[in-house]
């Protein structure tokens, strides 16, 4: 069991399972580079959270947006895009917003399409485990909504996925404690990463190291600040 100060972002699990180096660059070194794909993903999350009410009742479904999450067992905290509460005859929990019994059903919004790597499923399963710990009820299913297909992909939180999620959470804490960024390894999935140029810059006439790339990036940012002050 972890303490409050030891909790790490639930969203970091997706990065960790996709690539430990990407996770370390973001959460250890504080490096982030937007590209059209990440910007599209941010817009999708904003639409999921919406500007309307945080919760609304649609028939036998109560929709809650931007829901706070926490698990001391996994050592994670964060927010869920959407948690649907489905009305059930038995085995659910009571909510202040509506009468009856309800079961939580987390929904995470992602740009693109379903991936071969189960990084999105692990993140969603971690959200389910957080909800179980917070609400004291089993969460057996959820869904991933992909912007490219405009469809949901159902996810069952079976023993295998739960074990993968617990291992990923443990590894995330180990990685943060080690304070060491893993070495770069070129893989086909690197082309999908917004940090590709930071992680493994394309060699220029004199060769471009990560250090040189970051130095140039800082100089551009400082130049932008100077122009704003003028």
Where in this protein do the model-derived segments appear?
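Short, intrinsically disordered, charge-biased short linear motifs at domain edges
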Residues: 3-6, 171-187
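Nucleic-acid nuclease catalytic cores
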Residues: 77-78, 84-179, 191, 195-197, ...
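Exposed alpha-helical structural elements
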Residues: 12, 23-24, 43, 164, ...
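Metal-dependent nuclease catalytic cores that hydrolyze phosphodiester bonds in DNA/RNA
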Residues: 1-106, 222, 228-230
């Amino acid at each position: 069991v972890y303490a409050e100060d030891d909790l790490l972002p639930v969203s970091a699990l997706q990065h960790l399972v996709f690539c430990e180096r990407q996770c370390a660059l973001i959460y250890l070194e504080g490096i982030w580079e937007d590209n059209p794909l990440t910007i599209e993903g941010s817009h999708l999350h904003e639409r999921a959270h919406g500007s309307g009410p945080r919760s609304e009742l649609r028939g036998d479904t109560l929709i809650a947006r931007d829901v706070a999450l926490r698990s001391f067992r996994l050592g994670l905290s964060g927010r869920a895009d959407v948690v649907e509460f489905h009305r059930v005859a038995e085995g659910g929990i009571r909510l202040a917003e509506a009468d009856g019994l309800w079961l939580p059903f987390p929904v995470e919004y992602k740009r693109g399409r379903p991936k071969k790597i189960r990084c999105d499923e692990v993140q969603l399963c971690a959200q389910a485990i957080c909800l179980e710990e917070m609400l004291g009820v089993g969460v057996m299913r959820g869904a991933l909504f992909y912007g490219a297909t405009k469809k949901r992909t159902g996810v069952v939180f079976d023993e295998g996925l739960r074990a993968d999620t617990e291992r990923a959470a443990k590894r995330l804490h180990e990685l943060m404690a080690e304070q060491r960024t893993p070495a770069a390894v070129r893989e086909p999935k690197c082309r999908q990463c917004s940090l590709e140029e930071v992680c493994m810059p394309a060699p220029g006439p004199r060769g471009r190291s990560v250090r040189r790339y970051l130095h140039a990036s800082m100089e551009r940012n400082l130049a932008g600040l100077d122009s704003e002050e003028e």
